[in-house]
């Protein structure tokens, strides 16, 4: 049985009470249906039983992938620093109790839903999220030169077998376009930049485009 909490929230449309389920953690192996609801966005959606208006409400939780040895803490941007401290503390306590079992894990903190889905897909397909973030910067530059992306759009990359799929999303106007990307860009990024990864520091880290841009800037200054 899955552990969840029931919250009573007020419908923003009619003011009626709505019961809303939240989960403290999701295990991709034991809760595959919850994982599917997460990736589809259904996990955060609700329908008011009174006016039948539908809404969306996120909540923090821990995503646990025991197969690929991944722990991802999802939180809001406003609580990122606070959550990071708590996350680090909880992992340290778990290591004291369970010992070497957690040594093989990678730990990530994510404060944006699109990035969470991208990371789950990344690890499910055996990719390295550090390489993928660098690849996104390279792909983003190419798309900018072709006028296929602008400053209001976000880029996400997904493994699609023989190529990468670029999802370009504009949250302001709720639009998305998809573009095929040559997978060789990822392979080149892995070949050229993996040597600069600090394996110990990036075992537990916030890996995003900001992290990748900082790393590329350091590399350019060295060279």
Tell me what each language-model feature is:
Residues 3-4, 211-223:
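Short acidic DE-rich linear segments
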Residues 68-210:
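Long, contiguous alpha-helical scaffold regions
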Residues 1-78:
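N-terminal cysteine/histidine-rich coordination modules
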């Amino acid at each position: 049985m899955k552990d969840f909490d029931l919250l009573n929230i007020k419908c923003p449309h009619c003011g009626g009470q709505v019961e809303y389920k939240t989960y403290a953690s999701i295990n991709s192996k034991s809760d595959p249906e919850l994982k599917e609801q997460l990736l589809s966005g259904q996990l955060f959606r609700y329908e008011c039983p009174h006016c039948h208006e539908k809404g969306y409400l996120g909540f923090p939780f821990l995503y646990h992938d025991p197969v690929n040895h991944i722990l991802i803490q999802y939180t809001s941007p406003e609580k990122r620093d606070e959550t990071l401290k708590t996350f680090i503390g909880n992992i340290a306590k778990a290591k004291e109790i369970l010992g070497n079992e957690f040594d093989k894990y990678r730990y990530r903190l994510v404060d944006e839903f699109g990035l969470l889905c991208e990371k789950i897909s990344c690890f499910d397909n055996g990719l390295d999220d550090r390489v993928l973030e660098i690849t996104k910067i390279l792909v983003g530059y190419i798309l900018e030169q072709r006028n296929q992306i602008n400053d209001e759009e976000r880029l996400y990359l997904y493994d699609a077998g023989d190529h990468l799929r670029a999802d370009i999303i504009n949250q302001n106007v709720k639009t998305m376009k998809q573009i095929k990307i040559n997978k060789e860009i990822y392979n080149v990024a892995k070949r050229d930049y993996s040597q600069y990864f600090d394996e110990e520091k990036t075992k537990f880290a916030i890996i995003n485009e900001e992290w990748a841009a900082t790393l590329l800037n350091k590399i350019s200054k060295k060279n």
